[in-house]
Amino acid sequence: MGGYLLLGAFLGCGVVFSEALLRSRCGLIRLWFGLVIGLIMMMWSPIPFAFAMRFTRAAQLCGLALSAAIAAGSALIMRGKARYRGVFQGDMPVWMLLCLLIPLAILSGYLQYTHTLREIDGALHVGQSTYGDINMHTGIATHLRNAAFPPDYPILKGARLGYPFLGDSMITSMLLFGADMAVSFRITGTLMMVLVGFGFVAFAWEMTKKPLAVVVAFLLLFVNGGLGFIYTMDGESFREIFTGFYKTPTNMPEYNLRWVNVICDMFIPQRTFLTGWTVLLPAVYLLLLAVREKKRRLFISLGLWAGLMPMIHTHSFLGLGLVSAGVMLQALIGSSDRRKTLINFLLYGGVAVLMAIPQLLIWTVPQTVEGSTMLLRFNWVNNNGDGTLIDNYFWFWIKNVGPVYLLLIPAALCQKRRSPARGFMLGALLLYVVAECVVFQKNIYDNNKLFYVAFMVCLPAVGALLADAIDAIGRIRSLGAKAACAAVMGVFCAICLLSGSLSIGREIASDYVLFSESEAAAGQFIDTETAEDAVFLTGEQHNCVPSALAGRDLVCGSPTFLSYHGLNYAVQHADRRAMLENPAENAALFEKYGVDYAYISNYERGKYAVGEAWFAEHGTLVFESGSVRIYALS
């Protein structure tokens, strides 16, 4: 219970802070910013204290006290000043907001429940999209309990954790006060999805002021998908969408379809992406307000906000920066006072960079630069690796993104010359070009996290273009012509949304056992009966019980995670095999890594010629269930 109260306390601090500083904005905007600020406080405020006292309950309480002091101080300073009292500012329709956010909240809540360690008869179940990534996030969340700072990876002993971990550390904060891990992931995940949904509605409304444009843009973002459905037209392929593992029309690598649905394959499984967008949408909204209102305090506030983003989600931070560069260029072109405009943007960028540098130097640079994960590569996953393309350049993007791709340039050209939308689309173009030419991680696929930011900021303009087209159809006098145009528009929208809808349907139906009853019991035993700094010798499975369910250190984890994170694990990988297969001859390695336990299951027995007789003779069998055995070695 204490963990949920802690979350509520931080959210309350954020709302109080927002109520004080955003007094000129409507109630819903203040609430949105307040809840996001509360999450940021929960992620960031314990960190300075963790360097001094580890990531303990004391650090969380100190962080909460700091957040409460900031909130109370801002409320006192702004006391008595006028406040906008309306729930809505302007004429945003209530029906539009409810019709968009309620289904999103229900869908998100359901998927968070079914996809996050759902217990059935003692086993832990997940969905298709979380079968892989959830192991990394639960491992980090459990590993950070009482950890020294800066922390290390749980899956590679001694390697500094360079992955943006703050979205997982908020779960750690809740765990330290007794919250259930699965419930904590579900509550915060659903909350963040709703905040992302509202944030996009607010941004699209400010850009267009057209309800139909907002609805269209919202659907194109959250039900996104390309032309993959054409590969599922026969009965067998269509059935496989709902029964096969990753046979959805938005994620078919065999057909070079990699533009996945953002709900199914990004927001639900990739918690860092979801947390990043939770913080990104208010930043984009602030950027729009700053350009429109030309107030210096908005630019400085935006700089402070952006400066907190790198360790929340580095891709979102980079995406915001490149989009902002395009917005700045457009603002300078149309400004009557270019000096003031330039100073405003320099203040914004300067504050953000100064705050980001320590984060980048401590965490990001050692992993990205020293790990040699940056490289030049044209056209994302459509590149064979030798400079040649798998598909024709434009066909690749059309079949992945769908017909929406063809509307991006017309939508930009239809904007007024000094419209902020042009600046955002110029920024999207800059981001698109960079993401098309530079890969920032060994997992080339991860550049989609940049493409999605570019896609998102373009959608309000695309929605406005389609809304204008629909309005024009309504004004046609000839019934025949009107019917024909309406049919064309209907087919167009169906093509845009069909692949995404099928993918969401598959995700709703998916159910996989991630940890068997014996493995779940082993995880519970490890979590409660072994020391938090215990080191485990295991196989290389991605769903490794000691790390995923208890956050314990491993000699070496899954190559899938380690390679994509740019970590050099060759020595540890070889040493693991030597210790598992020839433990009698490798006593020095056990001492080198400080191995406390050996975790032996059917996976280890199938992957390695495990010298289990040696472990049974020289270790102590402390846990046995089904095929799982845990031997204490020290």
Residues of each region from the PLM?
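Membrane-embedded, hydrophobic transmembrane alpha-helices
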Residues: 1-92
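Start-transfer (signal-anchor) and selected internal transmembrane alpha helices
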Residues: 58-120, 211-215, 634
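Membrane-interface helix-loop-helix junctions at transmembrane boundaries of multi-pass membrane enzymes
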Residues: 83, 87-93, 290-298, 334-347, ...
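Active-site lumenal/periplasmic loops and adjacent helix-entry segments of GT-C-fold
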Residues: 104-279, 314-318, 512-513, 540
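Hydrophobic/aromatic-rich transmembrane helices and adjacent perimembrane loops
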Residues: 190-193, 273, 318-321, 443-471
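Membrane-interface alpha helices of multi-pass inner-membrane proteins
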Residues: 264-265, 298-314
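Hydrophobic, aromatic-rich transmembrane alpha-helices
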Residues: 281-290, 323-334, 400-422, 468
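Extracytoplasmic
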Residues: 474-634
